[in-house]
Amino acid sequence: MIKVTSAEQFNTLLETHQKVVVDFMAVWCGPCKLIKPEFERLSTEPEYRAIRFAVIDVDQVPDVSEKAGIRAMPTFQTFENGEKKGELLGADPNKLRKLMDELARV
């Protein structure tokens, strides 16, 4: 799990990893706290080992969050070869797993 702290780090992450999932969250966000353990658990599952997991605090890296079009937290975005492939707004564990399955299959 990578904690992204700058736009440069985010861009490098997308350039150097084929598949990436990003959790755009905020420390004050209740639903973000509820889904965090599930996101962390998914990052350790064998079927997702080819995917790089990252977290961005929208208050600490607002430029990346704004560029990504984040309107609510949590928002999960998936990327393949630097291009956005999917998005999930909200803290639904079943939908998060479905999003991960879609990225893992690509």
Model-inferred region functions:
Residues 29-32, 76:
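The canonical Cys-X-X-Cys-His
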Residues 33-47:
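Typically the conserved alpha-helix immediately C-terminal to a functionally engaged Cys/Sec
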Residues 62-71:
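Mid-chain, well-packed structural core segment of small domains
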Residues 1-20, 98-106:
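N-terminal leader/targeting and pre-domain segments
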Residues 72, 77-106:
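Non-catalytic, surface beta->alpha helical segment in thiol-disulfide oxidoreductase systems
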Residues 57-59:
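Conserved acidic residues
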